[in-house]
């Protein structure tokens, strides 16, 4: 519910998540109020591969699997492994970038970290974001897992996907896409 309110750009939700953050982090997170997402919650566990949330906006869309734990590392096995495999399948099938949002409990500041699920080559804006958003790290055996320390802080993710289109970086990215 917390992440849903933030991505939907609800000021109360953004404020609740950034309450113990420094002013710079808070300002980056507040950008979502200007460029919010329509966030749809999947009923129950959702359709296999659709994630817990679907964040939609005119220019971009992400299926998001939400996890939270007291431990900084979360290993995928059983049902969580099946969910991961389904996210890969749907991401490839629909040319989407599935994400994991991982919250570390009892952490001050930005407690959320964002990871992307590798689905191969993506085009347009998603292709550019692929280079910026970290992929799930791999164990020594080569199996993906969630390591909170290696994820992208939520405020950085918001700053990345909610920049105003007048921002020079986005204009140059759009020009590169069109050429």
Predicted regions and their residues:
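Acidic-basic catalytic patches of nuclease active cores, encompassing PD-(D/E)XK
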Residues: 1-44
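A short acidic (Asp/Glu
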Residues: 51, 75, 110-114
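Active-site beta-strand-loop-beta-strand hairpin of nuclease catalytic cores
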Residues: 46-65
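Short beta-strand segments enriched in hydrophobic/aromatic residues
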Residues: 57, 68, 102-105
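Short acidic (Asp/Glu) patches
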Residues: 80-86
